[in-house]
């Protein structure tokens, strides 16, 4: 097997870039966009490059490629993973390798805790609230392994939940419906008022007590409902106001932690985006059912918080069925979110994807499926300098009355996600334009969580750029299956420079520089 595997999910400025070279004998190249920055040969199965400026890089050898990024703060380009099993004696190597392979620079430790209102356990081994056996020693070892792999271990914590054993203590601070019944999740968790000073003091102290495990921060969860509720005395609690205040309180009381709050189904992103947290995280549910909805969620979140990276948690229940059809759905999801400047929470454990909100019941996937998905993450990391610093100019440059960019294909071309079409978008990037092409031509719908028809490479796509000066622009193409930017030779007409693209599967990026506007 030939593989290039970064030593870390993300490297820090001033840190040497170290890559495992498995089965690689020849030269290994470090590339920024289309410029070879350095070249080295493996020594003892490892390649090392000198520290590099912040940004995304490709790493290529004959028969293998990967990507790395150099970031002072990993959460400026987050790639979120998960772990959810902590049995005694569990090995950690597989999780660490998956973190490195998918460049997962933050990992959620889902349901690692003793109880929702008492995170640290009374004993080293215990059963969690749903009966899963947990070893705190295993949690510690996984935290250490994830950290060593260049990732931030994030402890799951629900912001307003208590179990049956704690409800009598907290009932006076409970959240109730108008008929007096308590708000609950299922039949085992009761919601408490997140504005209660008694609860806030307890909650932040409970969070602080977990830092000795080695966590870098917290995944602050809520359940989407209620959006408003009553206290026992009839006082109305508005969660739109309560959640940002809680986030800020956690940041003030546990200032050394990095925090991620779950905006369930986009509620209340408009309010929490200004709170003191690392990024904007949205767990996606109906009625956000289409690829267009995923695109809208990322776009809106970036507009609300321009300096906040965006993560979508869009669980693929399609993986409970045919894996090939689910992989195609994943490819379309990743292409959509990455090309809009967001990232996703989907991969984790040793080789698993999330199919529902209870992470313990994740789905293990085949090595070939994992490898196909990894190539999409590689592309997003390699070209992060373009994808995460882009302005969408599709509506002013492509389609309709616009003349700046033209796309021809064997199928219809659309500027929105449309089943049966090639979805084209134009992004303004430093020094030029980036055209994103997502192939939906074989699909009957654009539902993101539905099995998809496996795409065959689309051929005969032509991209034309309106000439701005005498010098022809430089055009190059990259895709998950061919990640190195490959130069394209344009044909010149009176007004346009046109290239015919090589066939590509599902997603391609065309970079246009020098003369593009």
Task: Give residue spans per PLM region.
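An acidic-aromatic substrate-binding cleft motif
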Residues: 65-115
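C-terminal beta-strand-rich structural cap/linker in extracellular carbohydrate-active enzymes
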Residues: 492-517
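Extended acidic/polar, glycine-enriched regions
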Residues: 26-27, 33-76
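Active-site-adjacent "subsite" loops/lids of carbohydrate-active enzymes
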Residues: 85-89, 155-213
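Active-site neighborhood of glycoside hydrolase catalytic domains
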Residues: 195-279, 285-296
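Aromatic/acidic polysaccharide-binding cleft in carbohydrate-active enzymes
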Residues: 222, 306-398
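Aromatic-lined substrate-binding rim segments of carbohydrate-active enzymes
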Residues: 113-159, 234-242
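Carbohydrate-binding surface patches
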Residues: 407-469, 508
